[in-house]
Amino acid sequence: STNEVAINLIKEKQKEIGCVYADTQTKGRGTHGKTWVSDKGNLFGSIFFPLKDNYPPFNEFSTINPIIISDVIEHFCEKQKINLKFPNDVFVNGKKICGILQELIISNSRKFLIVGIGVNIVSNPNTKSKYQATNILLETKKKPKIKEILDLIIASYEKFFVDLNSYNYKHFKEKADLMALN
């Protein structure tokens, strides 16, 4: 999984911040140990960064991450209904299009947040879940490049950290409540 690669980069290579992605994953995973189906042409990536003293606490990132990622999805799925199923799923038109796996690790007495992101771009799994899955191509007839989505995710996190002085959890929480899947 890309989260495992990120963990290795932090622990073994002492990388502070970064992004990794793969064309496919053989050991992709979701929450509660579920496997993440990894069809080529979709996005499988992880970003990671240290949780510095001036950053929001870890638990707030379970609201922040889906908002940041859903804003990116919304960019590619304009005029589509975007919802969130907390803490880790983004839905378009009532169908799951993205999964997020947030992990906290400690390395050299420092906390690091790893955000694993899977976005269905060109295909989606046939799940036995109560939630149907979809992909960007199916919903919009557009096929954005993986790098295009990844670059926007990175830029969105960079903007979040640059604007940290004006960070207000209440803003994220209110938006999250409005986007919650009923």
Ranges and model annotations:
Residues 14-15, 38-40, 85, 109, ...:
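A generic fold-level signal
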